[in-house]
Amino acid sequence: MCFFLSSLCPVVAERCRSLLVPEDSGVDVENGGKRTIPKSRNGMLGEDMDDAAPLESGLSMSDMQMGSFSTLKAAKRAEVGGTGPKVGRPRKLSVYNPREMSDGNPGEDCLVVGPSATVSHSEGLSASGKRRKQHLPFTVDDLDIMCGVPSPRSGAPCRQPLTCKSHSISSKRAVTGRRKPFDALLQDFKDNNSRKSQQADIPRPLATKVYCSGHSQRMRAVITSLYRESISGRSSLPQNEQTLALDANPQQQQQQHTLMSLNKVSECWWIWIKTPFCSGISMTQVRTTEGGDKVEVVLYAAAHLPAFTARRLSGYSLQRNQQAAHSGPIHVARSTLPFENPDFTGV
C-alpha cells in the first residue's frame, strides 16, 4: 500500500525542492511543474492559448517558452514581404536632377528636383534641412553700437561692434539710421571701454568706515609715538633689534598685546595692528604732513584680511629705506600671543 501511494504522490527533490510527479499518475501539480511564462510574454501570446496548438507563425507554446523570439520575428518578416526591409521604417528618397542624369528617367524612389520642380520648406527649414537662425530686426540703439554693414549674400546687417575689422571704415560711415556720425559713436565707444578698464584696475578699499574717535585714542598715541621716533633718529634700541619696549605710561602699557609692522614708502605708512579694542587684525594707514605735525589715521575692517596674513606677521622683518625722505630707524612692537602660535588660523 505504501509503495502504491508513493508512486502516485509527488516527491520533493532534495536540492531544488521542486515537485516530481510520474507521467502516468495523472496528478497536476502547479501547472504540471513547468515554469510559468512572465506577464510580458503572456500579454503577447494570450492567456487561452494551448501549449500543443501551433501558432499562425508555425511556433508552439513550448518554443515561445524556450525563448525563440528571433524565429518569430523572422517568420513575421517572411509573411510581410520576404527578406525586404523592416516594416514601419521609411525609405530614404534620393534626389534626382535631370541636368546630372544621363538617361533622364528617375527611379521609383527618386524625388524630382530641378528648375521646373519646386520644393516647399515648412517651419522655417532651409534647403540643407537645418533651421535658420532668425535675428531680431535692428533698432536705432543697435546701430549706434554695432557695425551695421549689410552682407553681400544675405543682406543682413553685420552685428559686430563698431570696431569690426571685417569691414572698412568707409562702408561703416555709409550706414544710415545712426543717431550720430560714425566717428563720434566710435570715439564714445572707445572712451567707455577705456573707462571700464581703468575702473577694473583700481583696487577697492577693504572697508569704508573710519575709526577716528572714542576708544581709538590709545591707538593714535601709540602710532604717533612710533612715527615720531622713527623720523627723529633718536632711538634707545639698536637698529638691528626688531622689538620696541613701550614707555612706562599706563596708557601705553595697555598696548602690550599690540602687533604692529610698519612699511615705509615715501611719506605713507601702512600698519598692521591688533589692539584690545579691535576684534582681529586691522590695516591702518598713517599719512603725515611735511613737518610731521598732523597724523591722519584710517583704520580698515579686520574681517577682509586673509588668514595667511596673520600667520606671516609673527615673523615679519623690516629693512631701512635709505632713499626715503625720512630714513629713520623703524621698530616693530611684537607680542607673544596669539600670533606667534603656529596653529593660529587668522580672524
From Swiss-Prot:
The keyword Secreted does not apply. Residues 134-201 form the SCA7 domain. GO terms for cellular component: SAGA complex. Residues 1-13 form the signal peptide. It comes from the Eukaryota. Residues 77-106 are annotated as: Disordered. Keywords: Signal. InterPro entries: SCA7_dom, SGF73. This is SCA7 domain-containing protein SELMODRAFT_439258. The lineage of its organism: Eukaryota, Viridiplantae, Streptophyta, Embryophyta, Tracheophyta.
